[in-house]
C-alpha cells in the first residue's frame, strides 16, 4: 500500500466517523435529518452550500473544459457570480416563507404556494430526474479521482462502490448534520489544494502565467478566446444566464437554504461566495497548464487533465492529499443529493398518494430509499459515457424549468395559476428531454437565423416555451374561473 492510498483511506474513514458522530445528542426526526432543525449559522450554511456547489466538477469538469475547450470554460466562473447576486434577494424570501409554514423540501414550497399537491409531485419528479445525473457525475468523478491518485491500486469500479456505500451509511444515520461537518474538512482541503495547484503548476512548467498563456496561444492560436461561431459570445451569455437561473433550483441546494437560523445569513453569504468562486479560476489554470504537458487527452479523457498533470509533477504523498480532497468533493454533495432525492419521493410523492402516512413512516421510508437511489445512480454511472460538464448541463436544463413558477410565486400578486405553472413545467421539461435525446440545437431548429442566434444555448427555447405556455394557460384558467364566478353570482 503506497502513501497516496493510506492518505485517501485515512480521510475517507475520518469523513465516515465525522458523518456518523454528527447525529450524537440529537433527536433525528425528519426535520433534524433534512434541514438540521433550522439552526445553522452563517459559517455552517456557507460551508454546506459551498460543499454542494463545489463538487467533483470543481476538480475535474472545470479543468477538463479548460483543457479541451479553452476560452469558453470561463463561463464556469461567470454564472456562479450572477447566481449569488440573485440569491441576495431570492433566498431570504424563500427562507421566510419556508419557516412560516415549516416546509422541509423544495416541493413543499411549490405545493404550498400554489395550493396544489399535484404540482408538488411534478416538482419532485423533475427534481429527482435532475438529481440522478448529478449524483452520477459525483460517482463518476469519484471513480476517476481515487483510481488515478491511487496509481491504479483501486479500480474506478471499486472506488465508486466504496464511495456509494460510505455516503449511504452516514446519510442514513446523520442526514444533513453529517454533510455539514464533513464540509468543514472538505472546504479546508480543497482551498489549500486547488490554490496551490493553480499557482504552482503554471510556474513549475512555464515560469509564470503570462508565459503559459503565450505558449498556448502560439501552439493553438485563438484557443483561449471565444470562437466566432459555436461556443461564441452568444452561447457564453445565454449559458451563463440559464445556469445562473438554475443555480438554486437544485432540490438539495434549495432545501439547504431552509437550514439557516435567519435570513441575514444569506445576505452575508451572497457577499462572501463570489470570492470563493475565484477558487474555480485556479482550477482552470491547472487545465490550461496541462494542455502542452499532457497532450492527446481526447473527449471525456479531458476530465483527467488535472490528475494526470499532478501524477507527473508530485510525489505519492501529495498525490494522496489531492485524491483525498477530490474524494470529499464527491462525498459532500453526493450525500445532500441522496438525502434530497429520498425525501422528495417519500414526503412529496408517496405521502401525497397515501395521505394517512405518519411522519415517522415518511422518515423511515426516506432513509430506506437512500440505498435504493444510490444503487440506481451506481448503475447509471457504469452505463453512461458522458463527460462531467455534459452531465451537469443536462441536470441544469431540467431544474431551470422550475424557476419561472418560483419567481412568480414570490410576487405580491401572482398572476400564474397552478394549472399554468404545471403546464409550463411540463412543456419546458418535455422540450429539454427532446433536445437532449436528439442533440438538437437552435441552428438545426431554425437554420435561417443569423449565426449569433443559432449559437444561443438551446435551453433558451425550452425556457421560453415554458414561460409562454405558463402564461397562456394561466390566462385561460383565470378567465374560466372568472366566468364561473360570474355565472354563480
Swiss-Prot record:
The chain crosses the membrane at residues 1-21, 40-60, 74-94, 117-137, 158-178, 188-208, 234-254, 271-291, 318-338, 362-382, 388-408, 422-442, 456-476. GO terms for biological process: transmembrane transport. GO terms for molecular function: symporter activity; transmembrane transporter activity. One of its GO terms (cellular component) is plasma membrane. Keywords: Cell membrane, Membrane, Symport, Transmembrane, Transmembrane helix, Transport. Belongs to the sodium:solute symporter (SSF) (TC 2.A.21) family. This is Uncharacterized symporter YhjB.
Amino acid at each position: 500500500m503506497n502513501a497516496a492510498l493510506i492518505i485517501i483511506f485515512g480521510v475517507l474513514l475520518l469523513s465516515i466517523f465525522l458523518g456518523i458522530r454528527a447525529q450524537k445528542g440529537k433527536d433525528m426526526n425528519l426535520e433534524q435529518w433534512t434541514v438540521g432543525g433550522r439552526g445553522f449559522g452563517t459559517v455552517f450554511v456557507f460551508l454546506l452550500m459551498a460543499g454542494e456547489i463545489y463538487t467533483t466538477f470543481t476538480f475535474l469538469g472545470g479543468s477538463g473544459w479548460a483543457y479541451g475547450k479553452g476560452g469558453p470554460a470561463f463561463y464556469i466562473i461567470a454564472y456562479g457570480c450572477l447566481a449569488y447576486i440573485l440569491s441576495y434577494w431570492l433566498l431570504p424570501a424563500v427562507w421566510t416563507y419556508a419557516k412560516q409554514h415549516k416546509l422541509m423540501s423544495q416541493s413543499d414550497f411549490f405545493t404550498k404556494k400554489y395550493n396544489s399537491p399535484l404540482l408538488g409531485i411534478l416538482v419532485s419528479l423533475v427534481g429527482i430526474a435532475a438529481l440522478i445525473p448529478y449524483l452520477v457525475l459525483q460517482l463518476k468523478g469519484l471513480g476517476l479521482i481515487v483510481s488515478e491518485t491511487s496509481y491504479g491500486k483501486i479500480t474506478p469500479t471499486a472506488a465508486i462502490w466504496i464511495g456509494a456505500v460510505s455516503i449511504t451509511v452516514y446519510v442514513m444515520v446523520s442526514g444533513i448534520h453529517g454533510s455539514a461537518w464533513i464540509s468543514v474538512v472538505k472546504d479546508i482541503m480543497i482551498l489549500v489544494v486547488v490554490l496551490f495547484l493553480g499557482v504552482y503548476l503554471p510556474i513549475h512548467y512555464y515560469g509564470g502565467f503570462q508565459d503559459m498563456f503565450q505558449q498556448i496561444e502560439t501552439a493553438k492560436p485563438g484557443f483561449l478566446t471565444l470562437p466566432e461561431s459555436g461556443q461564441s459570445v452568444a452561447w457564453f451569455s445565454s449559458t451563463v444566464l440559464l445556469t445562473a437561473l438554475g443555480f438554486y433550483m437544485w432540490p438539495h441546494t434549495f432545501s439547504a437554504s431552509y437550514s439557516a437560523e435567519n435570513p441575514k445569513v444569506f445576505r452575508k453569504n451572497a457577499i462572501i461566495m463570489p470570492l470563493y468562486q475565484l477558487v474555480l479560476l485556479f482550477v482552470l489554470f491547472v487545465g490550461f497548464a496541462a494542455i502542452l504537458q499532457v497532450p492527446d487527452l481526447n473527449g471525456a479523457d479531458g476530465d483527467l487533465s488535472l490528475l494526470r498533470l499532478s501524477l507527473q509533477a508530485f510525489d505519492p504523498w501529495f498525490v494522496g492529499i489531492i485524491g483525498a480532497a477530490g474524494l470529499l468533493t464527491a462525498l459532500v454533495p453526493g450525500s445532500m443529493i441522496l438525502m434530497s432525492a429520498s425525501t422528495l419521493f417519500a414526503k412529496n410523492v408517496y405521502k401525497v398518494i397515501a395521505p394517512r402516512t405518519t411522519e415517522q413512516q415518511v422518515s423511515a421510508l426516506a432513509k430506506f430509499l437512500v440505498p435504493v437511489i444510490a444503487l440506481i445512480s451506481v448503475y447509471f454511472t457504469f452505463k453512461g459515457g458522458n463527460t462531467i460538464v455534459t452531465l451537469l448541463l443536462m441536470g441544469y436544463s431540467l431544474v431551470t424549468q422550475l424557476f419561472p413558477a418560483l419567481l412568480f410565486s414570490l410576487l405580491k400578486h401572482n398572476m400564474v395559476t397552478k394549472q399554468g405553472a404545471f403546464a409550463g413545467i411540463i412543456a419546458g421539461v418535455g422540450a429539454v428531454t427532446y433536445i437532449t435525446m436528439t442533440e438538437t440545437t437552435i441552428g438545426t431548429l431554425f437554420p435561417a437565423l443569423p449565426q449569433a442566434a443559432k449559437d444561443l444555448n438551446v435551453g433558451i427555447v425550452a425556457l421560453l416555451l415554458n414561460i409562454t405556455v405558463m402564461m397562456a394557460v394561466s390566462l385561460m384558467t383565470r378567465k374560466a374561473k372568472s366566468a364561473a364566478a360570474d355565472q354563480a353570482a
